[in-house]
Amino acid sequence: MNEVYVFTSESVSEGHPDKIADQISDAILDAILAQDPKARVACEVLVKTGMVLVGGEITTKAWVDVEEITRHVIKDIGYNSSQMGFDWESCAVLSAIGKQSPDIAQGVDNQQTKILGAGDQGLMFGYASRETDVFMPAPIAYAHRLMEKLAKARKSGQLPWLRPDAKCQLTLKYEQGMPVEVDTVVFSTQHSPDIEHKDLVEAIREEIIKSVLPAEWLNDKTRYFINPTGRFVIGGPLGDCGLTGRKIIVDTYGGMARHGGGCFSGKDPSKVDRSAAYAARHVAKNIVAAGLADKCELQISYAIGVAEPTSIFVDTFGTGRLKNSEIIDLIHTHFDLTPQGIIDQHDLLRPIYRQTATYGHYGRENFPWERLDKVAELSKAL
């Protein structure tokens, strides 16, 4: 690929309303899995001014204090004053949780065969490329790092006027399929009313953006749009309603790869929307790391109650050292993509999900689906 082009991805902060909802959903999931690894959880959250509504379908032997968990997450994010329009101590927490349908349960938990079927039909994508050290597209990887840096600056007191809600958008210029410079940075952060706009712009540019993005990618042509409306005091749930599962592109590949449409947060790993998407990332990353391709996108699909995938598709975008059909044969040989196989391979029945709910589900080495444990076997095919 010799053409010159630009590509844009965005990330949002842990205080973004949709991300508040994702974190509460996954914190409740973690609390349940800590007591009952076989629980069935589909937890959805809505946040708006002064209230949190927790709903969904949960079947479990565990008991968890939904209200306490919800308030703890909001406090941890940093909404600790009514002046922000949202306060962990005073907000209302409403619960509307039911049980999983027995019609779904009988297909997922086959008591005769003891085989775990897929929790629903669906299609999932996994992706990896060589453009960053974590095998992720650079725009989304660096957008997440900008948001992480902002959170650290807020919580440490480095920039005391910061408030929790924020988002950024990063446009990178590519040559020969690799990022070479930053074209545009769009950065909007909630702030206290006493900070001057020019001081905010300088602090974000110098202490956040330039401390994260590679210096060789920044030049006098780089465009910065920092709080371009001039004021962002009203934010969080006071400014916008937040819902679980509305940031699926932020959670995955920033638009660089396709998406099957299912969200992750609040779902136990019997839901292939989540677990199979993680498995697809694991497969794609190991394929690229093994040198079978410089870029790989994988699609897998499932039928409800059926263990084996109904299809596997691979695209290496002309970068493959093997035919796509040969790579699919290797996937069948080296990866168990049944729901139970995925759960066992990645030890997914653990309370590990709250940490995934911010800054992306991929590209961080502490997640088990990021392991490069199949590289040696796959590379033998070259």
Swiss-Prot record:
K(+) binds at E44. It holds the Pfam family S-AdoMet_synt_M. One of its GO terms (cellular component) is cytoplasm. Residues 100-110 are annotated as: Flexible loop. Its main location: cytoplasm. L-methionine binds at E57, Q100, D240, K271. This is S-adenosylmethionine synthase. It comes from Legionella pneumophila (strain Corby). The lineage of its organism: Bacteria, Pseudomonadati, Pseudomonadota, Gammaproteobacteria, Legionellales. The gene is metK.
